[in-house]
Amino acid sequence: MSAFAALKNNPFGESIFNNTSNGDNHSRDDVEEDEVVQYIANSSDEDDDDDNDDNDNDQGNEDNNLFPLEISAPVDTSISSTPAPILNSRITQSNYTPNESNLKFSDNHVTITLNPSEYIIISGQCNLKIIKGSIKINQCHCLTSEDNKSYNIIALQSQSLPIISHYTTPEMEEDGVTSVSIIQLENSFSGIENISQIEPAFKNLISGQPNVEEPSLFKNYSFDIVLTETNGGYGLDINSYWINELNLLKSNKDDPTPKIIMIIGNKNTGKSTFCKSLINELLLTNPNRPVSYLEIDPGQSEYSTPCALSLSEIVQAQFGLAALPHKNNNIVKSRVEHYFGFTSAVNAPTRYVEIIEELFNHHQTKFSQRNHLIINTPGWVKGYGKELLNQITKIINPDKLILLSNNLNQEYPDNANILQDLTYQSLSIIPGVYQLSKYSAPQIRTINKLLYFHQTTTTGTFNFNDHLLDSSPLKISYACGNSPNNPGIYSTTIINHNIDNEFSHRDLCSLVEVSIYGIYSIKSNGNTKFDEMSCFRRDDGNSPFYLNPDDFDNLLSNETITSKFIGLIMVHSINPNDHYMNIYAPDIIINRLRKVLSTNSNQTNDYKLIMIRGEGDIPNCEMLYPEFINKKIDYLKSIKKRKAATTSRKLVDLKLPYISFETKSKVGGIWKVRKNIKRRGHHQKG
């Protein structure tokens, strides 16, 4: 039986939502069938997570820096057979029927009355406020009107949607009192609703596939109530196993000793969902005690900058998508980040472990006496990923290790293999929530990059009405042999690329262009002078200084050096004659860069800006500027129709880099093999 077929059953937990149809027959709009994120039995967790480079390679390679000798690969790479996972109950629509008495419309908000056993699924963006009574979110988080708080919800189709249900408190049950719950949903247009103007594939990211036959009642609002099944959307129904574990973890709210809780498991088991649920429960139970959140999954992070690892101090519950820093100042009090550069630890494992150790040490120094620490790990728990997990648990030694699995027996072969050699104080095994995402992992990472580069600090929103190329890039100078004192970028580094004397530095400009870079600000606190360091390569007069990745790591680990990760920039192009780069970045990052440069102009040139790159891929939708593409297509059409000379409109042939407009030949092109078909002459005559 296939893994997908086995996903139709659910033995885990009871729910008030179980009477609803599972809704298994979902098509995937705008997503090819082979892009769907799904669990495949007996497969490596890294094989299908990324496009090309995230493979579960267990063989050592002495000449490859991807597997440094500091971390040894496992000897035994055998993988036990794994049964197909089981699907958690799927809630695809609300059981709430709107009428004149339970639904009131206003210009900027709607008021909804929920009776006992009623629930709604929310899609889109809104501010939630409880007017009367109590509600439960995702059958787990209890909110009451006495809190007098407003909660911002960003519910995208790339994630499970929040479920809001009526709730009767234990005190009311004892008194035999039944009461309605009244909530208010207020508009909250953040700009994400316009993301399809940049990438049409995300046109249903906010509200799902529209129903042509039954137009939505909420078409003029920033949110929607899912009253009928949408194409691929489902609500988050937390099962009883999770609820029991969450209640156990929050029961010691008065314990002054903070706990370190690490969540592990295969990918697509619900690790991020459990982490956010646990954080919300801890904050709702004790609002005055912040929670530290260590994200070490660079491929599926929410609070972190894309391709970065972070430690966040969270002070308020958040339902749905975790907003970006400028939007959640009241949610995240502080954040420390380090640029990793890739979406998988396989590309730079030693650097990965070193960053985790640095972030954990920061928590131990700043927050260990007060905050609980929740750690979200990647889903790579086999082969070399298992070896990395061993290293991480030795560094952290969590008080509680929670394994999300499809079998609750600790002696089950897969569980035993994962837990072998791990370091922890206590263990819980709970069922994973195996849900298929509507969007593939690469698409979700593209969404995160678009959200990052289109954020606007001044308005606290996202600008998806304009492409980045609609505005001129920012010019920033760089230091080189002919201009060593330029105040801008001092050097550049590409992870896993140590260059030697045979490398032609004239090619460095081409290597740097059209990529996303992390940028650090570094300062020497001692007598060390960067201009005197021999580790910076200054071989070419017009190319940027280059710092090998090993030297970069040594520089940041130097006790006399102070470093800070500023954020991401997108390098558009380089002018080697005038020694400057054209870059794009969010305005919050540009302001940080200007602050560093202004500090250098007022004092000596103490601060240096160093760029570092990992995979560095720019989303295609940012490079394929529609206006240029359309002009090129019009020109090619005019040439094809032989009207270029007679057309009244003069067309210009744009020379666009990185884009091919060559059409496939119908003759001699791709062969399509046809099997078991015989031509008339092939039939034997009796």
UniProtKB/Swiss-Prot annotation:
Disulfide bonds: none annotated. It is an enzyme of class 2 (transferase). It is found in: Nucleus, Nucleolus. One of its GO terms (biological process) is cleavage in ITS2 between 5.8S rRNA and LSU-rRNA of tricistronic rRNA transcript (SSU-rRNA, 5.8S rRNA, LSU-rRNA). Pfam families: CLP1_P. Residues 1-67 are annotated as: Disordered. SUPFAM superfamilies: P-loop containing nucleoside triphosphate hydrolases. GO terms for cellular component: nucleolus; nucleus. This is Polynucleotide 5'-hydroxyl-kinase GRC3.
